[in-house]
Amino acid sequence: MGGWSSKPRKGMGTNLSVPNPLGFFPDHQLDPAFKANSENPDWDLNPHKDNWPDAHKVGVGAFGPGFTPPHGGLLGWSPQAQGILTSVPAAPPPASTNRQSGRQPTPLSPPLRDTHPQAMQWNSTTFHQTLQDPRVRALYLPAGGSSSGTVSPAQNTVSAISSILSTTGDPVPNMENIASGLLGPLLVLQAGFFSLTKILTIPQSLDSWWTSLSFLGGTPVCLGQNSQSPISSHSPTCCPPICPGYRWMYLRRFIIXLCILLLCLIFLLVLLDYQGMLPVCPLIPGSSTTSTGPCKTCTTPAQGTSMFPSCCCTKPTDGNCTCIPIPSSWAFAKYLWEWASVRFSWLSLLVPFVQWFVGLSPTVWLSVIWMMWYWGPSLYNILSPFMPLLPIFFCLWVYI
């Protein structure tokens, strides 16, 4: 084989007039298989070269659009391999041997007495009796049976049809009662949650009023800020947990909450005593312990003994009551405990623990109060997300 040619390049890689669909073999110094020799080193000057007459044909061949290889390519001499698309007729489907295909005849309907037993009640006699009903005749015939007149109002029509056909079919549920039964608890729940959010703002408002008494004429500023806990300036009613004044804010709100609870108890005591619901026997001022009024319900007889003071009334034959006065708060607490014990039977298991807790020394009580003041803020932060669930549980307990 010859080496590189010294004359200008005229090979397939440079002569654009010669089709070169694949673009490789830059110098085309091929082997003697194509009769290349030193006299005709270039492919373009070889008289025995194959001119690739099929290379000018552009079509879908074995190598994709525009790449139709000559000499049949890799897939042979078929028309598809040469890039010629031919349509092959599809073979017809085999004849069906299923004689049952196609529309089948409609099956016979079951008897009416099996599908609609309620319709069997309307026999000819019942139908004629219904037509004789004045309410039905009023739907189609005017008053007096003449062909002129006015038709009954629509509400009479509906009531007549509903009253006549009420004996057949299943009763329709009253959706109005169902909706009202669900709407009531939802309204109570919404009102309870709204009231709770407003009640929770009362201690904060009273705390703001309390702290404003120490800053007359100025803006209240928390005095608990120091170098050990550098925090931004804030109001004493909005101390963060890292502020030293946070525990004092919690103590103020705890006292405010106790005062609000005391006012609510006084109001409830006055209301229940006015309605005669408290198990406390009345005492007339300036008189003896014997009252001439009617006896109220008493939980402990007069001759019985109790470790706590209670109102004991007896009802002798003359109708008088012998009463021992006690604080109304204890009577109210006992009344609430009895009411809750009836509702929740498991509360009776707490009686020994409550009696033991009440019998503790004042030192233990002071220790408990101190622990509540010390750990109360952290417990409040833990339990505060669950506060809105209390009215929800209460509504579920009342309505379920």
From Swiss-Prot:
Keywords per UniProt: Acetylation, Caveolin-mediated endocytosis of virus by host, Fusion of virus membrane with host endosomal membrane, Fusion of virus membrane with host membrane, Glycoprotein, Host-virus interaction, Lipoprotein, Membrane, Myristate, Transmembrane, Transmembrane helix, Viral attachment to host cell, Viral envelope protein, Viral penetration into host cytoplasm, Virion, Virus endocytosis by host, Virus entry into host cell
Cellular component terms per the entry's GO annotation: membrane; viral envelope; virion membrane
Region described as Disordered: spans on this chain: 1-50, 84-116
Subcellular location: Virion membrane
Reported function: The large envelope protein exists in two topological conformations, one which is termed 'external' or Le-HBsAg and the other 'internal' or Li-HBsAg. In its external conformation the protein attaches the virus to cell receptors and thereby initiating infection. This interaction determines the species specificity and liver tropism. This attachment induces virion internalization predominantly through caveolin-mediated endocytosis. The large envelope protein also assures fusion between virion membrane and endosomal membrane.
Full protein name: Large envelope protein
Region spans: Pre-S1: 2-119
Entry domain remark: The large envelope protein is synthesized with the pre-S region at the cytosolic side of the endoplasmic reticulum and, hence will be within the virion after budding. Therefore the pre-S region is not N-glycosylated. Later a post-translational translocation of N-terminal pre-S and TM1 domains occur in about 50% of proteins at the virion surface. These molecules change their topology by an unknown mechanism, resulting in exposure of pre-S region at virion surface.
Intravirion side: 2-253, 203-253, 370-375
Lipid-linked residues (N-myristoyl glycine): G2
Cysteine-cysteine disulfides: none
Signal peptide: none
Stretches assigned to the Virion surface side: 2-181, 275-348, 399-400
Membrane-crossing residue ranges in chain numbering: 182-202, 254-274, 349-369, 376-398
Uses in industry and biotechnology: Systematic vaccination of individuals at risk of exposure to the virus has been the main method of controlling the morbidity and mortality associated with hepatitis B. The first hepatitis B vaccine was manufactured by the purification and inactivation of HBsAg obtained from the plasma of chronic hepatitis B virus carriers. The vaccine is now produced by recombinant DNA techniques and expression of the S isoform in yeast cells. The pre-S region do not seem to induce strong enough antigenic response.
Modification after translation: Isoform M is N-terminally acetylated by host at a ratio of 90%, and N-glycosylated by host at the pre-S2 region. Myristoylated; this modification is essential for its interaction with the host protein SLC10A1/NTCP.
Domain of life of the source: Viruses
Polar residues biased stretches: 96-106
Family statement: Belongs to the orthohepadnavirus major surface antigen family.
Residue span of region Pre-S: 2-174
A UniProt-annotated Pfam family: vMSA
A GO BP entry: virion attachment to host cell
Ranges where the record places region Pre-S2: 120-174
InterPro entries with a match to the protein in the record: HBV_HBSAG
Subunit architecture: Interacts (via its myristoylated pre-S1 region) with the host SLC10A1/NTCP; this interaction is essential for viral entry.
Entry-listed glycosylation sites: N320
